[in-house]
Amino acid sequence: MLRYGVHQTMPAEATTYPVPQIYREKGARRYGFHGLSCESIVRQMRAEEAEFPKRMVIAHLGSGCSVTALFEGCSVDTTMGLTPTGGVVMETRPGDLDPGLILYLVRQQKGNSDEALSAVETILNHGSGMVALAGMAGDMKVLQQAAAKGDGQAVLALKIFTRSVTKAIGGFCWLLGGLDTIVFAGGVGEHDAPARAEIVGNLQNLGISISSPLNEANLSGARRISASESKTAVFVIPAQEDLTIAMHVDRMARSEQ
């Protein structure tokens, strides 16, 4: 529950899948993930910023990736759904796919139906995403080094990744009616300056830009990296998921005393 609790504020139009009601009644809906990360970032923003952003997007980018839209600190939409397999492209997970492609993959497997489903589940969780696109480890630094040497598959993998994140942020900008703040979190979001630069560079037509010196500075902790002329503030904020769990446990323990 803690992993997606923050997403309980999403409206029905964001959580409901267009599938028969019998499956929706059994729990088939969009739950969202990285809730602890989002909660920790909202908490840090409230503590550090004099004016809390009304319209905010959090891009949690790591081995798993999600983008979440928040209005006045409450989640209104997010890219992951029933499982953490969907949404934007990830290290070993594909993100959103045509459902027909999944049926195609099942039919391509040998063995009985259970074996076929198990094989496709493994493909979708461990053999897709950047790993599948590049044909090598999905680590961003490895891919960037390969791309710099002219590896076409690595170049394509990086382009598809940044494009998927850009599309999510751009779509949520429309949904929110504008964007006051973008926050990058997660292993890639916090430590990969080139990835941040590429993603924000794709958003220049929205008046969003970052300062190269601030983006490339070897710093830790919460920091602002947007350029002075940017219409949207851009931050890098550590995802304090462990601390958030500890705070929840402490609160539960106190309530039982």
Regions found by a protein language model. Give the residues of each.
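Conserved phosphate-binding/catalytic loops in two-lobed NTP-binding clefts
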Residues: 193, 197-241
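Conserved active-site and cofactor/substrate-binding residues in soluble primary-metabolism enzymes
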Residues: 33-36, 40, 65, 96-100, ...
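Glycine-rich phosphate-binding loops at beta-strand->alpha-helix junctions
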Residues: 62, 180-203
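Phosphate/ATP-binding catalytic cores across multiple sugar-kinase/actin-like superfamilies
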Residues: 41-44, 48, 156-177
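A mobile "lid/hinge" subdomain adjacent to the ATP/sugar-phosphate binding pocket shared
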Residues: 109-157
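Beta-strand segments within the central parallel beta-sheet cores of soluble alpha/beta enzyme folds
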Residues: 55-59, 118-126, 181-183
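Glycine-rich phosphate-binding loop of actin/hexokinase-like ATP-binding domains
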Residues: 6-107
